[in-house]
């Protein structure tokens, strides 16, 4: 007999709930615990599989305790129709879940609980907050579907948050969403999908998949305003056959209209914030609390002449004007920072001009020599020549680019397909 004991707990505003499950041969043989709503939940889950228990509703504390207990232990035999659906608590993932069910699949909702800064000003609007986890669970249970929460707070802090802080300490401008989506988040979700026997992972991202040059590649979503292919660009193409992006052929308003039409409670939920772990704060305030305190240093022109003072080099990125506080006859921009001397070097916009960009680490997913290169999430793509290098690639831009920052992602497109991606390591 295969026996296993699962334990979970949750606390909020002085209330505590805990639950202990005895699992034998894949079913819950016994359940006990204490706290608001726990007794009823224990009664309801006895005799169920752990996956079946994930579809049982309970109060917030009791539900959180159950989710923690079963989160890493959910397992099932492969089912031809089963899919895992990444749930954020928002309208996009809710509609993706609905689409999966309407297509005849057997969806299992999964939410990653990730670390957010407890000192942040608006932690409830982020995609991985306790409120978002609860909203995701309620969406699944309202449709009679199982939902599992994976608590990855410590792993996320180690894999995403700490590199974000250390990148700024080196004078870079890192994009944590690229690191999160390109490796951490999808690795965890795909691993969960394998555990529950899911054939596909479904997400609410606005992106598509396309056959291009004989290979399945990521492609832009049809709505340019919502396209998220830049954030997903570092996904290994070998994983793409296991993914489904049902919203890639539509825009946000179509998604909200669909949610309203089918009565999803998430239809009017506000959009979650980027860089979720900031919990609503400006990144500078976050960095100040997590290892990069205010420290005065000089603002210099290109000849080394002192023009003013600043409160930390890491508060500036190439192309930035706001916060310089330097009076001059012509507009001045941050050109680069010097971490060792805590200096910020400023100059005219012309000094920001770049025509060559090196990416490392980086990859070309198919052989190409001409691309459209997107060097920041909100910037338009620029035509360029590309040459493969040992650990990445080098771009020669047709037109001058301004404010190119080390640490950002260079994402390469041919037509709408993502044909390469890497982290910017040098500019000339």
Regions found by a protein language model. Give the residues of each.
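AMP-forming adenylation/ATP pyrophosphatase catalytic core
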Residues: 88-91, 202-209, 214-428
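Conserved active-site and cofactor/substrate-binding residues in soluble primary-metabolism enzymes
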Residues: 14-16, 36, 61, 65, ...
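Short, charged/polar N-terminal "headpieces" of proteins
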Residues: 1-20
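Catalytic cores of large soluble enzymes that bind and process phosphate-bearing ligands
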Residues: 58-65, 88, 128, 152, ...
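Short amphipathic alpha-helical face segments that pack within enzyme cores
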Residues: 40-43, 95, 188, 405
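Phosphate/pyrophosphate-recognition segments in soluble nucleotide-handling domains
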Residues: 1-7, 60-91
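Active-site- and interface-proximal helix/loop "cap" or "latch" segments in soluble metabolic
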Residues: 14, 18-76
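ATP-dependent adenylation/nucleotidyltransferase module used to activate substrates
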Residues: 77-233, 253-254, 260
């Amino acid at each position: 007999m295969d026996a296993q004991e699962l334990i979970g707990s949750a606390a909020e505003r002085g209330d505590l709930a805990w639950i202990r499950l005895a699992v034998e041969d894949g079913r819950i043989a016994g359940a006990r615990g204490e706290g608001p709503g726990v007794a009823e939940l224990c009664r309801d889950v006895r005799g169920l599989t752990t996956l079946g228990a994930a579809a049982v509703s309970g109060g917030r504390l009791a539900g959180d305790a159950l989710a923690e207990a079963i989160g890493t232990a959910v397992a099932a035999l492969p089912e031809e129709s089963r899919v895992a659906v990444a749930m954020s608590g928002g309208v996009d993932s809710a509609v993706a879940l609905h689409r999966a069910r309407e297509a005849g699949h057997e969806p299992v909702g999964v939410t990653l609980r990730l670390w957010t800064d407890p000192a942040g000003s608006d932690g409830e609007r982020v995609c991985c907050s306790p409120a978002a986890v609860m909203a995701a669970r309620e969406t699944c249970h309202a449709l009679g579907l199982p939902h599992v929460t994976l608590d990855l707070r410590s792993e996320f802090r180690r894999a995403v948050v700490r590199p974000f802080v250390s990148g700024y300490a080196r004078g870079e401008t890192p994009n944590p969403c690229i690191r999160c989506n390109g490796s951490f988040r999808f690795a965890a979700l795909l691993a969960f999908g394998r555990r529950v026997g899911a054939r596909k992972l479904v997400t609410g991202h606005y992106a598509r998949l396309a056959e291009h040059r004989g290979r399945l590649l990521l492609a832009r979503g049809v709505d340019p305003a919502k396209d998220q292919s830049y954030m997903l660009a570092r996904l290994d193409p070998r994983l793409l056959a296991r993914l489904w992006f049902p919203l890639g052929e539509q825009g946000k308003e179509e998604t909200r209209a669909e949610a309203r039409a089918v009565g999803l409670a998430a239809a009017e939920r506000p959009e979650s914030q980027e860089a979720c772990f900031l919990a609503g704060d400006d990144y500078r305030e976050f960095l100040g609390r997590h290892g990069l305190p205010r420290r005065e240093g000089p603002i210099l022109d290109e000849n080394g002449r002192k023009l003013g003072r600043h409160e930390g080099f890491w508060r500036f990125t190439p192309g930035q004007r706001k916060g310089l506080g330097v009076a001059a006859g012509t507009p001045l921009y941050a050109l680069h920072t010097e971490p060792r001397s805590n200096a910020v070097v400023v100059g005219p916009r012309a000094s920001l001009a770049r025509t060559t960009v090196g990416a490392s680490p980086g990859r070309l997913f198919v052989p190409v020599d001409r691309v459209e290169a997107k060097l920041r999430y909100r910037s338009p793509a620029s035509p360029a020549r590309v040459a493969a290098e040992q650990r990445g690639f080098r771009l020669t831009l047709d037109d001058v680019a301004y404010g190119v920052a080390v640490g950002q992602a260079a994402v390469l497109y041919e037509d709408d397909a993502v044909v390469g991606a890497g982290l910017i390591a040098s500019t000339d």
